[in-house]
Amino acid sequence: MQLSDFDFDLPERLIATRPARPRTAARLLLAEGDRIEDRHVRDLVGIFRPGDRLVLNNTRVIPARLTGTRTRGEAEARVEVTLMEPAAAGGWRAMAKPLRKLKPGETIRFSDALSAEVAEKGETDLRLVFDRAGAAFDAALAEAGAMPLPPYIAARRAPDTQDDEDYQTVFARHAGAVAAPTASLHFDRPLLEALAARGVGFTEVTLHVGAGTFLPVKVEDVTTHRMHAEWGEVTETAAAEIAATKAAGGRVIPVGTTALRLIESAAASGAIRPWRGETDIFIYPGYRFRVTDALMTNFHLPKSTLLMLVSALMGQERIRAIYDHAVRHDYRFFSYGDASLLIPGG
């Protein structure tokens, strides 16, 4: 299975730099079996069935972009930092500019309330240990940090305060992600309430999306690719709700690839179980899904692991047809773009 099998031409004009307003006005490509329909997210109330269960990732994006200063004697230098993920040895793994000029033991000052020491430095990133922890760290980061937009948006415009709202889901609870579970950005409170009134169930899980989600695949034989690891949790309650839905004949529908990867990790034995830890599950064609019946997700980058995931769910030829339709009909792509609802079979 070659990387080139997952390539397609995407006009740059289809890369969304702002979301639809309101959130539910985003377009929705409904693909069920061989059928494709052009709908809108607000139409989900009539598409989902009573007894369906949506699995939502309740991670909260932290303001992971920081600008600080490093001082040597009388000289000060500006340093830009993007937090990537908590480090096993303590502190945070981070990218920094200029990385090559930083030295272990140096302190970067981000504000009067937040500083960090360079504990380790590698070829591509470093480990920072902050002078605050817990709630004090969260508060200082909220003051000093900015929302970490995906690179394909940040390359086209500067982040602003509107992104603080746009790049956060309405059910975000547990801080720790440095990228949003973007399919969930399409939901607002009225839509959630309307779906609940229809008899659709909701289960929340937590997967802290890391910066590794944007890393390119660098091998031609995709089966040899190694995924980045991300921390997640499926609680006892969540596992029981999903199991009950399956037993009752309902559909389990993750909202976003992060929720899908997490519940499939928790069902590695064949049945969904409570689960907590790091997952590096890599889903590509040939994978046998254990609990997922359908998926709501945005449109993904060419040659990405997420395109491989949806190809595993729907089949490679079917995904090619779906993406060809999306491009021809001017669907908006990536994090702030439109959505698809992928239902195999039908």
From Swiss-Prot:
Enumerate the SUPFAM superfamilies for this protein. Answer: QueA-like (SSF111337)
Give the keywords, sorted: Cytoplasm, Queuosine biosynthesis, S-adenosyl-L-methionine, Transferase
Q: What is its EC number?
A: 2.4.99.17
Please verify whether the record's keywords include Cytoplasm: yes
An example GO biological process term is: queuosine biosynthetic process
What Pfam families does the record point to?
Queuosine_synth
Reaction(s) this enzyme catalyzes, per UniProt: 7-aminomethyl-7-carbaguanosine(34) in tRNA + S-adenosyl-L-methionine = epoxyqueuosine(34) in tRNA + adenine + L-methionine + 2 H(+)
Gene Ontology, cellular component aspect: cytoplasm
Q: Where in the cell is it found?
A: Cytoplasm
Q: Where is the signal peptide?
A: none
GO MF annotations in UniProt = S-adenosylmethionine:tRNA ribosyltransferase-isomerase activity
Entry function? Transfers and isomerizes the ribose moiety from AdoMet to the 7-aminomethyl group of 7-deazaguanine (preQ1-tRNA) to give epoxyqueuosine (oQ-tRNA).
Official protein name in the record: S-adenosylmethionine:tRNA ribosyltransferase-isomerase
Q: Which organism is it from?
A: Cereibacter sphaeroides (strain ATCC 17023 / DSM 158 / JCM 6121 / CCUG 31486 / LMG 2827 / NBRC 12203 / NCIMB 8253 / ATH 2.4.1.) (Rhodobacter sphaeroides)
Which lineage do the record's taxonomy fields give for this organism?
A: Bacteria, Pseudomonadati, Pseudomonadota, Alphaproteobacteria, Rhodobacterales
Its gene is: queA
